[in-house]
Amino acid sequence: ILLFFSFISHCFNLFLYKYKYLMTLQDRINIISELGIYLRKNFLEDHFDSIKIATVKNPWFTVKSITNAVLSISDMVEKDMLNAWLNPYTIKEPSSSKNVLIIMAGNIPLVGFHDLLSVIIMGHNPVIKLSSNDNVLMPLIINIFLDLFPSNYNQIKFINDVKGRSFDAVITTGTDNSANYFKYYCKDAKKIIRKNRRSIAVLDGSESSQQIKGLANDIFLYYGLGCRNVSKLYLPCGYDLNILFKSFYL
């Protein structure tokens, strides 16, 4: 009898665990898409004071750049966009959630959000080390995120130091130097370690004025601090630079 009740108790606890933390993929998509609706409709007005604090703590984070980042995330987490992103993959629900360390960059506002999204949508537990350059907006977004999940979901954690800790997997973004540091301290975990990156643009001279305006945005958005900001141009011989200057300086 004792063994029977022990077995029933174990099954019940397992059920509670799965109910609490391992929602279905579609459940997670539905909740995450609600975040996008809130970000687009209410975030900028509801949290303008926090946005101003972020601009003071990091002068590179202007209200304009923060607004652009928030609206970009709201587009990213629309239900149709999430489904289009995930549809090419065969995704199985995890038998147990893994602890995934995310070491976030802070070069542009909320740059670590996509890593956070990737971990959550797969049903795993993010363990976040914030960048000192983006330690106002990201916790704010995460708290809003948690409010959308069931009240018993509390699987997002923050840490200040990775030394002496173990993780199932690691996602880091940093410099070539910091990559060596992370490789050493996270040597036993599965990992994605991003180093310095630069983006280039190759023009052949047939670009429309609209495309050139788009290129200007790719160069100057976020003051060029993003790894996807174009920092090098390849132009054909004899290219009329005034075509670029008209878009760059207007």
Task: Describe each model-derived feature in a short phrase.
Residues F5-L101:
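N-terminal Rossmann-like NAD(P)+-binding subdomain of aldehyde/semialdehyde dehydrogenases
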Residues A84, K190-I192, L250:
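Short secondary-structure junctions
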